[in-house]
Amino acid sequence: MQRSIVPGLVAAALALAAGSAQAAACDKPLFLTFDTGHMGVAPLVAEVLARQQVKATFFLANEKTLNDGRSLDAQWAPWWKARAAEGHLFGSHTFDHVYWRADRAGGGFDMRPTFGPQADHVVRMDAAAYCAELQRAATRFTEMTGQRMAPLFRAPGGKTSPALLAAAGQCGWHHVPWSPAGFLGDELSSEQFPNASLLQKALRDIRPGDILLAHLGIWSRQDPWAPAVLEPLITGLKQRGHCFATLAEHPTYRDALRATPTRP
């Protein structure tokens, strides 16, 4: 156990240090984030990030993939391990991609998992159960990569309540939404929102400090956003003087991650 945990801590510390050096030379930072998806575009996303020397933050859930597997199964473990070795940052998206529906009057929450044995059913979770759901993704990440996950999470759909955020905070998790201009539109209809218009809008509206949101594959979009938009977006933003960093350097999360860089 000691042999697997210590290298993970060292790698996390090195990633934070590398991010600090990058941010120090950058006065117009952006924070590119990816939520899991059907994973069909994941290899191409990784190629673009490596070619452009961009570090991103990934939020992990165990989602259905194009070949009827799961995004955190054994097939994808080498892919996640390679991204971890490249110095990207990782947070939880809840293991079963669990949507918050409502706070319950007597305490706890109505939640709807997208995947898993209770998929598409509304289930009650108390604070401890929700924390365990967040931790499941972190545990699986460590199994796949030998590294530990950052104490960051993104609720599916960004749907939360003050009570849910407080419950997650009590067990050490910090929620990460996205900036309005950072919604890159890969979830939208490609007929109504073609890639060219999404790229134009992003280049026009994104401002320094924005958190950008994309996915590793969206089932409903017929003309995939990535990699068609991803690389011209990155190069276009760089031409405007922007640079990219992980959320370890975002002012909202930086101090918390330096104090507690990883989950147990």
Language model: regions and residue ranges:
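Active-site beta->alpha N-cap acidic-glycine motif
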Residues: A24-Q118, V122-M125, E133-P151
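Acidic-and-aromatic substrate-binding clefts and catalytic sites of carbohydrate-active enzymes
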Residues: T36-V41, N62-Q75, V98-D103, L152-P162, ...
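C-terminal domain-boundary segment and adjacent tail
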Residues: A24, A56, Q222-P264
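N-terminal signal peptide c-region/cleavage motif recognized by signal peptidases
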Residues: A18-S20
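Bacterial N-terminal signal peptides that target proteins for export
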Residues: M1-L9
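His/Asp/Glu-enriched short active-site or ligand-binding loop at hydrolase and phosphoryl-transfer sites
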Residues: K159-D205, H242-Y253
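A cross-family glycoside hydrolase active-site/sugar-binding cleft signature
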Residues: T33, T57-A61, G91-H93, R154-P156, ...
